[in-house]
Every structure is written in C-alpha cells, then in structure tokens.
C-alpha cells in the first residue's frame, strides 16, 4: 500500500505538540482591525489550541505528525 500524503496546506497552518494538541494561529486578524477593541487585538496574538473535534480533523490531514 502506498504512503499516505500530508496535506500541504495543513502542515503550513497547524502544529501538533508533543502531547498531541493542535496549535493554530488566531483567526480574524487580516483586515478591519481599526474597529476592533484593544482587548480583542491583544487577545488575538500568538496561537491557540484547537478544540477536540477540530483537532481530530486536522490530524487526519497530517498522518505522520501524531
């Protein structure tokens, strides 16, 4: 049986930690930030952990990053 392929778009956007959690960048920061509150902008920095159902889907895209 041939090797499974990793989705190139997923490996660029997500990172699986050593404990199995999936990290992703915060969404909603591309444009329109002038009308956002300072708290929103501050809280949207860095990365966030995906929820369990979303993490399961993303792990399916990256079979060798578990």
Swiss-Prot record:
List the GO biological process terms: translation
**InterPro entries in the record:** Ribosomal_bL35 (IPR001706), Ribosomal_bL35-like (IPR021137), Ribosomal_bL35_CS (IPR018265), Ribosomal_bL35_sf (IPR037229)
Q: Known Pfam families for this protein?
A: Ribosomal_L35p (PF01632)
GO CC annotation terms, alphabetical = cytosolic large ribosomal subunit
- MF annotations from Gene Ontology: structural constituent of ribosome
Q: Which UniProt keywords apply?
A: Ribonucleoprotein, Ribosomal protein
* HAMAP family (alphabetical): Ribosomal_bL35
User: What family name appears in the similarity comment?
Assistant: Belongs to the bacterial ribosomal protein bL35 family.
Name-wise, this protein is Large ribosomal subunit protein bL35
The organism is: Ruegeria pomeroyi (strain ATCC 700808 / DSM 15171 / DSS-3) (Silicibacter pomeroyi)
Give the gene symbol: rpmI
């Amino acid at each position: 049986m041939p090797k499974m392929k990793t989705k190139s778009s997923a490996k660029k956007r997500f990172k699986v930690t050593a404990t199995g959690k999936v990290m992703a960048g915060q969404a909603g920061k591309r444009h329109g930030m002038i009308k956002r509150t300072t708290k929103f902008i501050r809280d949207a920095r860095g990365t966030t952990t995906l929820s369990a159902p979303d993490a399961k889907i993303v792990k399916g895209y990256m079979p060798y990053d578990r």
